[in-house]
Swiss-Prot record:
Catalytic residues (positions): H248
Gene Ontology biological-process annotations: lipid A biosynthetic process
Protein's organism: Microcystis aeruginosa (strain NIES-843 / IAM M-2473)
EC number: 2.3.1.191
Family of the protein in this entry: Belongs to the transferase hexapeptide repeat family. LpxD subfamily.
Biological or metabolic pathway of the protein: Bacterial outer membrane biogenesis; LPS lipid A biosynthesis
Full protein name: UDP-3-O-acylglucosamine N-acyltransferase
CDD domains referenced in this protein's UniProt entry, alphabetically: LbH_LpxD
Chain's gene name: lpxD
Length: 343
């Protein structure tokens, strides 16, 4: 693909004032690669920061750059064709689609798939080998069910949603349009509901449902549990990594991002655009406001306000956590000083 063709296809995707290109070179681009291993005839991207130095040494034939005149000049001097954008990472994400399309089977129902006669199947649906679609399931247009996926009775799945191999969707779950459920994920299993009695524990039946709004993505081996009553809901465009647990009655807002090994107890509420880094744990009924961020391994026991950035366990403002961490490193020294004062 010629560089000019790439530029032409990408230019409508960004605001015109935030995209520039060096027009005098039009090389052939054969692949898209990370900047660290870029070779001749490939295109890569640089956001700046520690990667800025790669402009001077990369073998890439073309680059997507930030709106940085110094980096652009370096690329010119090395004969590298370039595009520049206010958001080079986003432009690079669009560029990947020009070179790669994920596997999408043709519409068909495999001979070994088990589809209940009462299931309603939309147009251009693919159902892979050994998949199970039980009674009263509704599949929208363009849905793709990969091999060994299991869909329990009464599930509704919206248009163009993809269920990857070996995922399980329990009864009455509602999944919107353009969602992606990755392999091994379990949506709508029973929440952890038991009442203590003298004999041990009395099981509370989980009669509620799980709702995934449009554009939700659930990573491999993640779980979203249904509640005893009511619903567990994940807002539109929220993205959830692998190995995440979302307990019963959780309410997650729109466009949130949850990294691997996040664990949420029952009844947690997240606002919109909340970011939870890896291994964040959230206690029962805690509420987190819009735009809040929790850094890796934060333990949240109480409510967090909108826009707050928290770290540590128990969670505290990130700036305070940095001071605490600095003091923690000096504890042996401080201990010895206190010990001397006691003498």
């Amino acid at each position: 693909m010629k560089f000019s063709e790439i530029a032409q296809k990408l230019s409508p995707l960004v605001q015109s004032q935030s995209l520039t290109a060096y027009p005098d070179r039009n090389p052939q681009i054969k692949a898209i690669t990370p900047i660290e291993t870029a070779l001749v005839d490939t295109i890569s991207y640089i956001e700046g920061g520690k990667f800025a130095s790669f402009v001077a040494k990369t073998d890439a034939t073309a680059l997507i750059l930030p709106l940085d005149s110094n980096l652009q000049q370096q690329a010119d001097e090395r004969g590298i064709a370039w595009l520049a954008s206010a958001n080079p990472r986003l432009l690079f994400a669009h560029a990947i689609k020009l070179f790669y399309q994920p596997f999408q089977p043709q519409p068909y129902i495999h001979a070994t798939a088990v589809v209940h006669p009462s299931a309603k199947i939309g147009h251009k649906v693919a159902i892979g080998a050994h998949a199970v679609v039980e009674a009263n399931v509704t599949l929208g247009d363009g849905v793709c069910i990969h091999p060994n996926a299991v869909i329990y009775p009464g599930v509704h799945i919206g248009d163009r949603t993809i269920l990857h191999a070996n995922c399980t969707i329990h009864e009455r779950v509602q999944i919107g349009n353009d969602c992606v459920i990755h392999s091994g994920a379990v949506i709508g299993a029973e929440g952890f509901g038991f009442v203590p009695v003298p004999e041990g524990w009395f099981k509370m039946e989980q009669s509620g449902i799980v709702v995934l709004e449009d554009g939700v993505e659930i990573g491999c081996n993640s779980t979203v549990d249904r509640p005893a009553v009511g619903e567990t809901r994940i807002g539109s465009q929220t993205k959830i990594d692998n190995l995440v647990h979302i307990a019963h009655n959780c309410q997650i807002g729109q466009a949130c991002a949850l990294a691997g090994q996040v664990g949420m107890a029952g009844g947690v509420k997240l606002g919109n655009r909340v970011i939870l880094a890896g291994q964040v744990g959230i206690a029962n009924q805690a509420a987190i406001g819009d735009g809040a961020i929790a850094t890796a391994q934060t333990g949240i026991h109480n409510d967090i306000g909108a826009g707050e950035v928290v770290s540590g366990s128990p969670a505290m403002p990130h700036k305070l956590f940095l001071k605490v961490a600095a003091a923690y490193k000096r504890l042996p020294e401080i201990y010895q000083a206190v010990k001397q004062l006691k003498k």
